[in-house]
Amino acid sequence: MINGKTQLRVLMSGCLLTVAAGSYAWSADAKAGKATYDKLCVSCHGADGKGNPAMAKALGEKGLNVVAKDVQAKKDDELLKVIVEGAGKMPASGKNLSQQEQKDVLSYMRSLAK
Protein backbone atom coordinates (compact mmCIF):
# COMPACT_ATOMS: atom_id res chain seq x y z
CA MET A 1 0.00 0.00 0.00
CA ILE A 2 1.23 3.53 -0.77
CA ASN A 3 1.60 5.87 2.17
CA GLY A 4 0.45 9.50 2.14
CA LYS A 5 3.93 10.88 1.50
CA THR A 6 4.40 8.71 -1.59
CA GLN A 7 0.93 9.63 -2.89
CA LEU A 8 1.80 13.31 -2.54
CA ARG A 9 5.05 12.82 -4.49
CA VAL A 10 3.25 11.01 -7.29
CA LEU A 11 0.56 13.69 -7.44
CA MET A 12 3.10 16.53 -7.49
CA SER A 13 5.17 14.80 -10.18
CA GLY A 14 2.06 14.45 -12.33
CA CYS A 15 1.21 18.11 -11.87
CA LEU A 16 4.73 19.19 -12.81
CA LEU A 17 4.71 17.03 -15.93
CA THR A 18 1.34 18.45 -16.96
CA VAL A 19 2.57 22.03 -16.54
CA ALA A 20 5.82 21.28 -18.38
CA ALA A 21 3.98 19.63 -21.26
CA GLY A 22 1.55 22.55 -21.49
CA SER A 23 4.39 25.06 -21.56
CA TYR A 24 6.14 23.14 -24.30
CA ALA A 25 2.99 22.88 -26.40
CA TRP A 26 2.43 26.64 -26.29
CA SER A 27 6.00 27.82 -26.68
CA ALA A 28 6.40 29.84 -29.84
CA ASP A 29 8.65 28.58 -32.63
CA ALA A 30 10.09 31.39 -34.77
CA LYS A 31 11.38 28.90 -37.36
CA ALA A 32 7.88 27.49 -37.89
CA GLY A 33 6.56 31.05 -37.85
CA LYS A 34 8.83 31.97 -40.76
CA ALA A 35 7.10 29.42 -42.99
CA THR A 36 3.71 30.92 -42.15
CA TYR A 37 5.03 34.49 -42.51
CA ASP A 38 6.52 33.65 -45.93
CA LYS A 39 3.21 32.17 -47.04
CA LEU A 40 0.77 34.78 -45.71
CA CYS A 41 2.59 37.97 -44.71
CA VAL A 42 5.69 38.57 -46.81
CA SER A 43 3.90 40.05 -49.84
CA CYS A 44 2.80 43.08 -47.80
CA HIS A 45 5.23 43.17 -44.87
CA GLY A 46 8.36 42.20 -46.84
CA ALA A 47 10.99 39.55 -46.15
CA ASP A 48 12.73 41.86 -43.67
CA GLY A 49 9.49 43.01 -42.02
CA LYS A 50 10.02 46.62 -43.10
CA GLY A 51 7.11 46.54 -45.52
CA ASN A 52 6.77 46.29 -49.27
CA PRO A 53 6.71 49.90 -50.60
CA ALA A 54 4.85 48.96 -53.79
CA MET A 55 2.16 47.14 -51.81
CA ALA A 56 1.89 50.00 -49.31
CA LYS A 57 1.33 52.44 -52.17
CA ALA A 58 -1.21 50.17 -53.87
CA LEU A 59 -3.14 49.70 -50.62
CA GLY A 60 -2.76 53.29 -49.46
CA GLU A 61 -1.42 51.93 -46.17
CA LYS A 62 1.52 53.07 -44.07
CA GLY A 63 1.49 50.41 -41.34
CA LEU A 64 3.21 47.60 -43.21
CA ASN A 65 6.49 47.83 -41.24
CA VAL A 66 6.24 45.20 -38.50
CA VAL A 67 9.73 45.86 -37.16
CA ALA A 68 8.99 49.52 -36.41
CA LYS A 69 9.55 50.45 -32.77
CA ASP A 70 5.90 51.37 -32.20
CA VAL A 71 4.74 47.99 -33.53
CA GLN A 72 7.35 46.03 -31.59
CA ALA A 73 6.43 47.95 -28.41
CA LYS A 74 2.91 46.50 -28.52
CA LYS A 75 2.04 43.60 -26.23
CA ASP A 76 1.73 40.13 -27.70
CA ASP A 77 -2.02 40.01 -27.13
CA GLU A 78 -2.46 43.27 -29.08
CA LEU A 79 -0.50 41.95 -32.04
CA LEU A 80 -2.17 38.55 -31.90
CA LYS A 81 -5.53 40.32 -32.10
CA VAL A 82 -4.42 42.02 -35.33
CA ILE A 83 -3.19 38.69 -36.73
CA VAL A 84 -6.47 36.98 -35.83
CA GLU A 85 -8.97 39.75 -36.63
CA GLY A 86 -7.07 41.80 -39.20
CA ALA A 87 -6.79 45.60 -39.20
CA GLY A 88 -7.37 48.19 -41.88
CA LYS A 89 -6.85 46.39 -45.17
CA MET A 90 -5.01 43.48 -43.56
CA PRO A 91 -7.21 40.39 -43.75
CA ALA A 92 -8.03 38.33 -40.67
CA SER A 93 -6.08 35.08 -40.36
CA GLY A 94 -7.79 33.67 -37.29
CA LYS A 95 -9.79 31.09 -39.24
CA ASN A 96 -6.75 29.98 -41.23
CA LEU A 97 -4.20 29.63 -38.43
CA SER A 98 -4.16 27.57 -35.27
CA GLN A 99 -3.32 29.33 -32.01
CA GLN A 100 0.13 27.74 -32.20
CA GLU A 101 0.69 29.08 -35.73
CA GLN A 102 -0.43 32.54 -34.60
CA LYS A 103 2.12 32.52 -31.79
CA ASP A 104 4.81 31.15 -34.09
CA VAL A 105 4.33 33.89 -36.68
CA LEU A 106 4.37 36.52 -33.94
CA SER A 107 7.61 35.03 -32.61
CA TYR A 108 9.13 35.22 -36.09
CA MET A 109 7.92 38.79 -36.53
CA ARG A 110 9.57 39.73 -33.22
CA SER A 111 12.79 38.02 -34.33
CA LEU A 112 12.97 40.25 -37.42
CA ALA A 113 13.44 43.29 -35.20
CA LYS A 114 16.50 41.85 -33.46
Residue positions per predicted region:
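Bacterial N-terminal signal peptides that target proteins for export
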Residues: I2-M12
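Absolute protein N-terminus
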Residues: M1, A25-D29, K114
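Electrostatic cytochrome c docking/interface patches
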Residues: T18-T36, K74
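Short hydrophobic/aromatic-rich motifs at helix boundaries and adjacent loops
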Residues: M12, K50-N52, D77-E78
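Periplasmic/extracellular electron-transfer cofactor-ligation site
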Residues: A30, K34-E61, A87-P91, S111-K114
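Axial heme c-ligation environment in periplasmic c-type cytochrome domains
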Residues: K57-N65, K69, E78, V82-A113
